[in-house]
Swiss-Prot record:
Belongs to the transferase hexapeptide repeat family. It holds the Pfam family Hexapep. The lineage of its organism: Bacteria, Pseudomonadati, Pseudomonadota, Gammaproteobacteria, Enterobacterales. GO terms for molecular function: acyltransferase activity; nucleotidyltransferase activity. Its EC number is 2.3.1.-. This is Putative uncharacterized acetyltransferase YaiX. Keywords: Acyltransferase, Repeat, Transferase. It is an enzyme of class 2 (transferase).
């Protein structure tokens, strides 16, 4: 089950939904107002949750509730600032920083010291260590290697626009990340510029900079090694 259609308050029976969901239009996250269907799917209300929370984990509910699904493990040193929802059977790695507005689906793995802010992470996605994922969507079964970065702010301080099959959309958002399609695989230190879309089943080699929307395919940098000193 995809979380994003519920968060957009979209008509799930619509016959002509946009090719790419307008992920920037989702409503502010209020955990106790999620639909019962979502709560059941994320196993937020089961009687025996068996959640494992290690020592020195900080759960800060000053700005909103933090709700965690069954059989999820939160490792040593992680910081979670509500409002946040984490589904069932997830692993939140050591010193991960989960910031407000984030909702994480079932079976997600978050690596060491990764920071996630105001993002939707769909089911069975894997996000490696030391990544920064902000104002973005990571679709189901996507894999992000270490130190992947989603840029969410233009240096000229202009609102972020998104190029879609329907045309260029002025989102009005000062901060907006990207949409990473399902089953995409991103190598170490990939950087995605604001408002970009990576199509499903796309593979990006290490250190690729995503400057434009990418259709499904395999992409890599061409490297030239020059030996000197002989």
């Amino acid at each position: 089950m995809d979380l994003l259609p519920f968060l957009l308050d979209a008509n799930l029976s619509a016959t002509n939904p946009p090719a790419i969901p307008h992920w920037w239009k989702r409503q502010p996250l209020i955990p106790n107002l999620l639909s019962q269907e979502l709560k059941n799917y994320l196993k937020l209300n089961v009687k025996e949750k068996n959640i494992q929370i290690a020592d020195q984990v900080i759960i800060d509910e000053t700005a909103g509730e933090v709700v965690i699904g069954a059989n999820t493990r939160i490792c040593h040193g992680a910081v979670i600032q509500g409002p946040v929802v984490i589904g069932a059977n997830c692993l939140i790695g050591n010193y991960a920083f989960i910031r407000p507005g984030t909702i994480i689906s079932n079976g997600v793995k978050i690596g060491f010291a990764t920071e996630i802010k105001n993002a939707v992470i769909e089911a069975e996605a894997t996000i490696g260590p030391q990544c920064f994922i902000a104002d973005s969507v990571v679709a189901n079964q996507a894999y992000l290697g270490a130190q992947v970065r989603t840029s969410n702010h233009r240096l000229d301080e202009q609102p972020v626009s998104v190029r879609t099959p329907e045309g260029i959309i002025a989102t009005g958002c000062d901060k907006l990340g990207c949409y990473i399609g399902q089953r995409s695989r991103l190598g170490v230190q990939v950087i995605i510029l604001p408002g970009r879309i990576i199509s499903p089943n796309t593979q990006l080699g290490p250190r690729v900079i995503v400057e434009r929307n990418l259709p499904t395919g395999t992409y890599s940098l061409r490297q030239e090694l020059i030996r000197t000193g002989d």
